Regions:
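N-terminal alpha-helical transmembrane segments of multi-pass membrane transport
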Residues: 2-143, 259, 282, 286, ...
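Transmembrane alpha-helical segments of multi-pass small-molecule transport proteins
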Residues: 5, 28-43, 68-75, 234-260, ...
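Helix-loop-helix connectors at the membrane interface of multi-pass transporters/channels
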Residues: 8-18, 180-198, 222-246, 277-283, ...
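Membrane-water interface regions at transmembrane-helix termini and the short interhelical loops
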Residues: 12-18, 44-59, 78-99, 147-154, ...
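Transmembrane-helix boundary/entry motifs in multi-pass membrane transporters
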Residues: 16-25, 60-64, 94-112, 146-157, ...
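Helix-loop-helix module between adjacent transmembrane segments
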Residues: 17-28, 32-42, 75-78, 114-118, ...
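Membrane-interface helix-loop-helix modules in multi-pass membrane proteins
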Residues: 74-81, 85-181, 374-379, 383-384, ...
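Low-complexity, proline/glycine-enriched hydrophobic segments characteristic of transmembrane helices
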Residues: 315-319, 380-473
Length: 591
């Protein structure tokens, strides 16, 4: 075992070739991790879920305004950086060139940024907003346009601006100024050398915990949807036990990618995943009609821009229904993105060395926002248009024949509910049920049960596959698209886990940009353990509560980091001006 510390490096302990840690940060993060998992396992269940929901609601009620204000502030700061006088500064030496091609760079940041979530929510969120329109939004938008605009709002400019700010700050301090690739470095212009002590240890530990909570949420979501896809394809039963087994299996795949490293592992998988995801999107686009997709893309963009100013600052301060909606949707998303920002920001910084600030902001904010909007249009608009067209068809047939037809729609078993909205069980223990033709919109809100009536189906992770089934008449195309979607989710899962373990390892090793593989394997396993524990404790709502809670203290860190970046850029600009003045002074005539 060896220990080393210099004026430019944080203390590190090295055990052999494969383990390197910052003694305080690593130990503190592991202790918190063990406590979290122990509490989730020992006290998991309805009571634990209730406490998680109450904590989430308490934070939303008292600090929702902070999430809303900070995310809009991050977007404004990103625009200022891209258009300001520091936009030419390179993240590294002045003569340094980007390490990765633009295509590889984009594939890696997008796969890490929000891949699992986009697949999970691209169908479910537009349906939710369509069925329960957000209260108090701008007039002039019909239900479909409003649902799509709000969905794109949550996945558009704001989260990518946040990632850009965090990634830019880390890259600037790490590659331009030569500081440790660590979150404490971002606070140095404001807090001075105190960040190299215990205060910095706290900041880096917060970054690790926020990352674990954010990634655990995504891994839990991914496990639910992989379970739904395998159930659709192979009849594998759904449930928490199956999902935890899937987390274990896919985490094992992620460890293989960890061993292969950044170039052979994450980069190759990200490039493959982008190709497969693009293929899935094309299937949906041509299945729903290319012209309809292009028309919807333009209309959705206009609707998004129409609501953007109002929604960016909306807290629901004057209406309890609006406040509840903002807390359940916008505040959750903003907190989720903030808890993801240490991971995504650090990863983007790690693969963005050599790019200018303008190139970095443009690539990280604009391109993924456009792709996310197109993706959501392909899936979300197809879902809503299919539903409205079937309703119109049924209405026309009802007027003419009094026998409305839902021909072409698959049938599902829907359970009957009692007066308390509970499924009715028959004497043999199965749910009372009838077979009904459903669109994807109707499916999400229906009490769907398994064909044998033994169990209720979680429609949220399943609705993506229902959309696919209702869009294609050919069983072969349905199986191809469902299989493709399931593989994409698995690959997004693997790249997210691998990328996050690399980022956590960088922080926990004291800012080493290339930490050894042993501790990265440990963090990959830890992410799967946290996701499994939170699923056991209370499912998706427990995962959401963990993300909202972990994001709160880190929001303060990010606000101070923005201040620190502005100061550091100003100092760099002044040094460049001084250098230019010295160079431009003519030689003395008397000399």
């Amino acid at each position: 075992m060896t220990s080393n510390k210099t004026t430019t490096e944080l203390p590190r302990l090295r055990f052999g070739k494969h383990i390197e840690i910052h003694p305080v940060v690593f130990t503190a993060a592991v202790l918190i991790l063990v406590a979290l998992v122990a509490v989730s396992i020992l006290y998991g269940g309805p009571d634990m879920l209730g406490r998680c929901i109450r904590l989430r609601d308490w934070i939303g009620d008292r600090f929702g305004w902070l999430y809303v204000a900070s995310m809009s502030g991050f977007l404004g700061f990103a625009i200022w950086l891209a258009m300001g006088r520091y936009a030419h500064i390179r993240l590294g030496r002045d003569d340094e060139q980007p390490e990765y091609s633009t295509l590889s760079w984009f594939a890696m940041l997008f796969s890490a940024g929000m891949g699992i979530g986009l697949l999970f929510f691209s169908v479910a969120e537009p349906i939710s907003h369509f069925q329960s329109p957000p209260p108090g939004f701008a007039e002039g938008l019909n239900a479909t346009r409003l649902a799509m605009a709000v969905t794109i709002f949550h996945w558009g400019l704001h989260p990518w601006a946040l990632y850009a700010i965090v990634g830019l700050s880390l890259a600037f301090f790490g590659f331009r100024l030569g500081m440790p690739l660590s979150f404490r470095s971002l606070l140095h212009p404001v807090l001075g050398d105190r960040v190299w002590g215990r205060l910095g240890d706290v900041v880096d530990t917060l970054a690790i915990i926020a990352t674990l909570m954010g990634v655990a949420t995504s891994l839990g979501i991914g496990a639910k949807q992989v379970n739904a896809g395998l159930s659709f394809l192979l009849g594998i039963p759904s449930g928490t036990g199956t999902q935890i087994s899937l987390i274990a299996a896919i985490t094992a795949l992620a460890t293989i990618s960890v061993v292969l490293g950044l170039d052979a592992g994450i980069r190759r998988l990200s490039e493959l995943n982008i190709v497969l995801a693009f293929g899935l999107m094309l299937l949906l686009i041509f299945g729903g009609g290319l012209v309809a997709f292009l028309s919807a893309s333009i209309e959705n963009l206009g609707a998004y821009l129409q609501i953007l100013p109002f929604n960016s600052f909306r807290t629901g301060a004057f209406n309890s229904a609006s406040r509840t909606w903002v807390n359940e949707w916008t505040v959750f998303y903003w907190a989720w993105w903030i808890s993801w920002s240490p991971f995504v920001g650090m990863f983007i910084a790690r693969v963005s060395r050599g790019r200018t600030i303008r190139e970095f902001i443009t690539g990280v904010v604009l391109v993924p926002t456009v792709v996310a909007a197109l993706w959501l249009t392909a899936f979300g608009t197809a879902t809503l248009r299919q539903h409205t067209e079937f309703l119109e068809q049924a209405a026309l047939q009802a007027d003419s024949t009094n026998t409305p037809s839902m021909a072409g729609l698959p049938q599902y078993w829907v359970g009957e509910l009692d007066a308390n909205k509970q499924l009715i069980r028959q004497d043999d223990g199965t749910f009372r049920r009838t077979q009904v033709s459903l669109t994807a919109v109707e499916y999400l809100s229906s009490p769907v049960v398994t064909p044998d009536g033994q169990a209720a189906i979680d429609t949220l992770p399943t609705v993506l596959f229902v959309l696919i089934e209702t869009m294609f008449q050919s069983p072969l195309l349905v199986m191809l698209a469902v299989g493709l979607a399931t593989v994409c989710i698995v690959l997004f899962f693997v790249t997210s886990s691998d990328s996050a373990s690399m980022v956590i390892d960088i922080i926990a090793s004291g800012g080493n940009p290339n930490p050894p593989v042993g501790t990265r394997l440990f963090w990959a396993l830890a992410e799967g353990l946290v996701a499994s524990a939170l699923l056991f404790a209370g499912g998706l709502r427990a995962l959401q509560a963990a993300a909202v809670t972990a994001a709160l203290p880190f929001t303060i860190v990010l606000i101070i980091a923005c201040w620190g970046l502005a100061k550091a850029l100003h100092n760099t600009g002044e040094r460049e001006k001084s250098k230019n003045r010295v160079i431009s002074v003519p030689p003395s005539e008397n000399g």
